[in-house]
Amino acid sequence: MSAMPNTSSISVSAAFDAHRPLTLTYIDNPSTKHVIVGMSGGVDSSVSAVLLQQAGFVVEGLFMKNWEEDDGTEYCTAMDDLADAQAVCDKIGIKLHTANFAMEYWDRVFEHFLAEYKAGRTPNPDILCNKEIKFKAFLDYALTLGADYIATGHYTRRSVNYKNNDGIEVAQLLRGLDNNKDQSYFLHAVGGDKLAKTLFPVGELEKPVVRQIAEEHDLITANKKDSTGICFIGERRFKDFLQQYLPAQKGDIVTDDGINIGTHDGLMYYTLGQRGGIGIGGVKDRPEEPWFVLAKDLDNNRLIVGQGHEHPMMLSNELHAYKLDWTDGLPPTDIFSLEGLRCMAKSRYRQPDQACRVFAVNADGSEVRVIFDEPQRAVTPGQSAVFYIEEVCLGGGVIASIDAPCGF
């Protein structure tokens, strides 16, 4: 594939005209290209396999088991998902491999997940799962099977390949065409070198079209419900699951003006901006308005709450992020300038784009300071700040801290 300019060596705005989306028809001689599809047992990966097969690629599937426990009957179990994946592969006539990455998942994802909750933060394990398992362990395994590419059912796109300033062949991550389903937020930590070996067949489609294709091919997954929630929890109650691994310590619920009004079940069960499930009824001499989580006082094990959807303690103008992953492999040079990098950001999934400036706070651009044009509500440490310019996802990092106009 042709070389492309990258945002590390030229102005960011000038580079993006060259970031052409990669489509399946762009790849030469597909009949000589071996693609292994991550088959989850869902409709998106099923249709991805169909589209690749129709485009002429040599296609096989691989089902990943990332979690050993499978003791529930109220949610779709791994065995059910495997059966559906096998049924789809049988239907379209491709081989299905299986691989167990449970040990890798525990070491690289789950232990980090527990450590973050123990530290009072709210992590997003799906982002780390994509980085460490789906686009690392799976990719590495697929390459041993002779794959030229892997493919997944994510609603995102990527550019054609180009070489960055270090001479490494990479691709840029692009938003999916379906704005309601775009998953680039969850894939921002996947390196461009991994993206260069990945195909996203449904990234050019909207969800209703994907289901229509599945129905036309009489796939068992055509009307299967989309999976929701953290992958290893399934449909189980989050609190019940977390209690198996982290002992909860009850503490006081305190208002923003210092009044004790209740008892919380453990700070790890709450997140900033949360409204429901706090366990506060009517409070004497207070208006009948909803209560929101404003802060966690870790030193004193107190949950700070207040009333008002736009309470000042929930608003912040700046955040500090660390563990930055830049898709290109190199940070945009603009973050080292006095003016910073002008771009859009999301501090949570599905949040509308927020205008901001990004400044490096260390020499390699792995930590940044983000200043928003407008105050942001309920920015949560442990979640990710992800940066965009138009359709291009530049990368992102973990939110370490925020500033707030008011403190407790």
UniProtKB/Swiss-Prot annotation:
Reactions accelerated catalytically: S-sulfanyl-L-cysteinyl-[protein] + uridine(34) in tRNA + AH2 + ATP = 2-thiouridine(34) in tRNA + L-cysteinyl-[protein] + A + AMP + diphosphate + H(+)
Predominant localisation class: cytoplasm
Site, as annotated: Interaction with tRNA: H154, Q383
A GO BP entry: tRNA wobble position uridine thiolation
Pfam family, one: tRNA_Me_trans_C
Keywords (A to Z) from UniProt: ATP-binding, Cytoplasm, Disulfide bond, Nucleotide-binding, RNA-binding, Transferase, tRNA processing, tRNA-binding
Keyword flag Ribosomal protein: no
Region called Interaction with tRNA, residue ranges: 181-183, 348-349
Biological function: Catalyzes the 2-thiolation of uridine at the wobble position (U34) of tRNA, leading to the formation of s(2)U34.
Official protein name in the record: tRNA-specific 2-thiouridylase MnmA
